[in-house]
């Protein structure tokens, strides 16, 4: 293998890496994907929601054959205190186009399927091998060193996940700071398909996506999530790494208390724990973006920090897919001119500007806005308090709605309400 020179070596068989391999192989490029896990997706952890638009135009109708779990039609956003919750519920009963849909997925299944599509197109995959170093010649990346073997390529695409050591060694990425990432933990809880559908009011392959703010992370930056799969639930939480030193609870204890919350416990009652996983999640958006392009090298997916936590929804997989496609298109263009210089590969950033970077730039101030203790303590308590007063009738004299809101608003502080409101308008 060391005698071959590939058009591209891709480090990592996640979504970005697999899509890059697929798009390249379809055009006849010689592609090698190196995955340190025993299979594609073996090392990947996600809450579990894939927005279909970025993959739909690469593999039209992919959901008909891919191992997607459920079509998300129900959205829930809950503000939680220790014992109560105020939930907003949206049900989409309208017919949507394939590119407007989203699905719950299990990465171990989905990533393996996607990599199979790339292999069928001609890409090569080796697993269980770690890339230790990138090979450079005259300042240009010309291959990788893996398991003591040097494998050469005209380009290398780094899709090796958040905190890419290889990108750091190249000087293209800085060491990840605690403020840039969060710790995510997830349990996969097995329940009968019919039970899931009854509890979440689903029909057929419909699914629900639920996000929770407040008590799941003990009032710290982050939140809980729950996604319905075919016969399992993906339940977990994410907490900003830089806040953990202030935490009164460990992350496992946060998760256990979240599971016992009155709004959550009935949903998972009787379920069987079949999997536990933990992962570091990029949270800083475009503010943690590395240098995306070098001589002979590109960075994509989580390795490039391509994740967006908007509070009401979380995006990462669709951005990774778009980045993988953009990287592949850039390499194909470079192959035509036999120019793999940094200047030529800069086309990659141009492709990204019409997708991931455009979206990430729009919300670049959001991470700092959300890194506000009131967002995960004061405001959930405000929402729950107003809801409690609204629905409580005890025979005492009635109180106007505005007075209920003002009374609870005092706890947050009216100056804080005004400041946060004005800042929210500029950010969102």
Swiss-Prot record:
Q: Name one GO molecular function term.
A: oxidoreductase activity
Q: Which regions span the lipid bilayer?
A: none
Q: Which Pfam families match?
A: FAD_binding_3 (PF01494)
Signal sequence segment:
none
Give the protein's cofactors. Answer: FAD
Q: Which domain of life is it from?
A: Bacteria
Query: InterPro entries, per this entry?
Result: FAD-bd, FAD/NAD-bd_sf, FixC-like
Record keywords, A-Z: Electron transport, FAD, Flavoprotein, Oxidoreductase, Transport
Any Gene Ontology biological process: carnitine metabolic process
Q: Which family does it belong to?
A: Belongs to the ETF-QO/FixC family.
Q: Known PANTHER family for this protein? A: ELECTRON TRANSFER FLAVOPROTEIN-QUINONE OXIDOREDUCTASE YDIS-RELATED, PROTEIN FIXC
Sum up the protein's function in the record's words. Could be part of an electron transfer system required for anaerobic carnitine reduction.
Name assigned to this protein:
Protein FixC
Gene symbol here is fixC
């Amino acid at each position: 293998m060391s005698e071959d020179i590939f058009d591209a070596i891709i480090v990592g068989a996640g979504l970005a890496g697999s899509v890059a391999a697929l798009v390249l192989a379809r055009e006849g490029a010689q592609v090698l994907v190196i995955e340190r896990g025993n299979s594609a997706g073996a090392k990947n952890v996600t809450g579990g929601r894939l927005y279909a638009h970025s993959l739909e135009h690469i593999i039209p109708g992919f959901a008909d054959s891919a191992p997607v779990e459920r079509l998300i039609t129900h959205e829930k956003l809950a503000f939680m205190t220790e014992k109560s919750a105020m939930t907003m519920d949206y049900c989409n009963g309208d017919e949507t186009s394939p590119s407007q849909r989203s699905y719950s997925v299990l990465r171990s299944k989905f990533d393996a399927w996607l990599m199979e599509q790339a292999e069928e197109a001609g890409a090569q995959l080796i697993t269980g091998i770690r890339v230790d170093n990138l090979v450079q010649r005259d300042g240009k990346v010309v291959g990788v060193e893996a398991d003591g073997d040097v494998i050469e390529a005209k380009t290398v695409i780094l899709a090796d996940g958040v905190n890419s050591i290889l990108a750091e060694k190249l000087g293209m990425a800085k060491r990840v700071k605690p403020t840039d990432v969060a710790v995510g933990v997830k349990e996969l809880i097995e329940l009968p398909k019919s039970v899931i559908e009854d509890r979440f009011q689903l029909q057929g392959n419909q699914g629900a996506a639920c996000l929770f703010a407040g008590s799941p992370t003990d009032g710290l930056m982050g939140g809980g999530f729950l996604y319905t799969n075919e016969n399992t639930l993906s339940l977990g939480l994410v907490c900003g790494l830089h806040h953990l030193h202030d935490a009164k609870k460990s992350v496992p204890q946060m998760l256990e208390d979240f599971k016992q919350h009155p709004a959550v416990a009935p949903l998972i009652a009787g379920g069987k724990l079949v999997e536990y996983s933990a992962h570091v999640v990029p949270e800083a958006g475009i503010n943690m973006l590395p240098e995306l392009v070098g001589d002979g090298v590109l960075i994509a997916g989580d390795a490039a920090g391509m994740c967006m936590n908007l509070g009401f929804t979380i995006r990462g997989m669709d951005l990774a897919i778009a980045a993988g496609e953009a990287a592949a298109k850039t390499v194909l263009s470079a192959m035509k001119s036999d120019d793999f210089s940094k200047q030529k590969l800069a086309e990659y950033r141009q492709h990204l500007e019409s997708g991931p970077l455009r979206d990430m730039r729009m919300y670049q101030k959001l991470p700092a806005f959300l890194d506000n203790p009131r967002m995960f303590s004061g405001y959930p308590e405000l929402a729950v308090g107003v809801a409690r007063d609204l629905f409580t009738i005890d025979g005492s004299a009635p109180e106007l709605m505005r007075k209920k809101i003002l009374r609870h608003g005092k706890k947050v502080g009216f100056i804080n309400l005004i400041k946060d409101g004005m800042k929210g308008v500029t950010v969102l």
